Amino acid sequence: MALVASLSAVAIEQDNDGNYLIGTASDWDAFAAIVAETPGANALMTADIDLGDDQTMIGTEAVPYQGTFDGQAHQLTVNYSVTEDYVGPFRFISGATIQKLHVEGIINTTRGFAGGLVGYVPAGTNQISQCMSSVNITSTQGGREWVGGFVGGCNNSGTVLNIDDCLCQANITAAWAANFVGIMYYSSHVNVNNSLSVATCANATQFNSIYHYIYGHGTTRNTYILNCTVSYTDHGSAGTVVTMDQLADGSIATALQADRTEEVWVHDEIPMLKIFMEDNSHTGLAEIDAAQPKSGIRYNLMGQPVGKDYKGIVIENGQKFIVR
């Protein structure tokens, strides 16, 4: 093991392969500073991290992140509040790989290009694999803000973004939004495979199932959407629309697993990535405590009011919970 001093004067441990080991909010800040000098730096998360009110994001417009970040099934909790474009834990990526990471928390912005994992993808071939977004994302811009449950925007000829085996549980409040990628522009390519979204979107005038596109190119394979209001039909994409009954009966988990030898998807209340079920059957959703019941109106994932005896995933006071 080695200790490396970053620009923030916090020493980050590295393993024998040179991966930076990220286990605290201070490590996150220090790694962001390292990326500003060495954009191809690789990292492994070693613990769940709550950033609190820390506004640090990795990658800048001038120096996008280009390395491999492995969350190792850990959770990153964010609370970003910004007044400028491009927001996500990874603000800009170009030729990066992000895998096995669960992001939850809050993103509030008065502008656009907000994503649960990534703000903007301007170049390179990029990979997001086995990740989960449970972020509450709100943009007050009022139009053309391009908010995505995973990525805000993807742009430029030759830019490729692959999203494989990912689960979107985001709650989005924005006028123009999509389950996975807010917008892809001008000959960029977005490919979404073996993925599921149970995201919700409020205040949307343009909400699409996978992504919006303007002269971009995209493919969608074996990807399922619970809430699909494709209101921007000339520039939208289609996944397979499913019902809560299908999510509950295990058939979609089987379809997502797709006869692979390695177990990637398992069945819980909804299909779940296996890596997030290893410890304490973690689903990324809190359970409602019967001893401390919530006081708001309770809805199912189709937006229909349900009683307090309803079992499964519910939305109450703008948050998703599990009632067992």
What are these model-derived regions, one by one?
Residues 69, 298-299, 314:
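Short aromatic-centered micro-motifs
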